[in-house]
Amino acid sequence: MRDSFHRQITYLRLSLTDKCNLKCGYCWTSFQHDCPAGSAENGRLGEFTSFGYAERLMSVRAAAKVGISKVRLTGGEPLCYSGLVDFIADVKRVPGIEGVFLTTNGTMLADKAADLKGAGLDGINISLDTLNRDKYKRLTGFDMFDKAMGGIQAALSSGFGKVKVNVVLIGGFNDDEIGDFVNLTRDEPLDVRFIELMPMTGSPLFGKEAYLSGRVVLERCPDLKSVGMDDPSSVARLYALGGAKGRVGLIEPVFSSFCDKCNRLRITYDGYVKPCLHSSDEYSLVGKSEVEMERTIRNAIDAKPREHGDLRCLRTDIDGVTTGGRSMRRIGG
């Protein structure tokens, strides 16, 4: 289905839970942990909402009927969701769904990567913002750096064709590690993707002084050469070092907006369709039949704005961007 600006909407980001076993400063708007001691078991408490397993699967079927073909499962931390493996297998069976992907912090991935692959998961994005153990603990609140690195290796060993490492660029925190991240691509078939920080209103740690343009990566690593994009709807411009097994991606929502080719919708963990990340507009799927969900999703697609309202402000004043009153963990990363 096309929206009112003729963009083909094919990509659904579906949040399974708002719980997470880490506590990264740019994702949270308060300092209260809801998964003490990094526990995945505690995170599972978040599943018991009025929008559960059956409703989420129904929403995928409804979305597929309007043209969604790619689903990315997010959180919170989706590996906190105890039904994840079965859910992936069920989504893969939905007619029209061609790919199912996962975004995770990787800390619980080592023991689950093989099962996820067996369920039909097509690719994994792993969020990792530093290669320094002390900084990792400072950012996330937990000393789980080794588990995150083990998750990356488990994903590679399990045969996933697409393993991506997402790095949020944070001025004064990890910009001294850009070269180290780029070097990860030399010997491993990883896509390391640098993402511009979009400071969210209410984020306790990072303001406009932390923003860095993705172009700083090219300035620090002049040996990177452009290799284009994976497809026209991709948000990452890709580069590579000569002879490297992997690639480097730049995702620049501030410096180089991609609203004009946005092909995605989000469904929050509690059952609301968000046509735009930075819009307060939400469309409830709670308590609806599959037919009603399909109608609601169509309405949300029709309501997608040309670009998010904060975009112009971002380019001139990086004080903070609204997400419709929700922190990122309550929307879906």
Question: Model-derived features: where do they sit?
Answer:
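Short, flexible helix/strand-to-coil boundary loops that buttress conserved ligand/catalytic motifs
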Residues: 28, 113, 140, 277, ...
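A short acidic, helix-capping loop that chelates divalent metal ions and anchors anionic groups
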Residues: 35-37, 132-139, 201-205, 284
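Radical SAM/AdoMet-radical enzyme domain recognition
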Residues: 50-73, 77-195
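A short, compositionally biased micro-patch
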Residues: 17-19, 119, 268
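Residue-level signature of catalytic and energy-coupling elements of molecular machines
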Residues: 16, 192, 271
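Glycine-centered loop/turn positions within well-structured domains
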Residues: 22, 133-134, 257, 283
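Auxiliary Fe-S-binding modules of radical SAM enzymes
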Residues: 1-10, 187, 197-333
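Canonical Radical SAM [4Fe-4S] cluster-binding loop centered on the CxxxCxxC motif
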Residues: 4-52
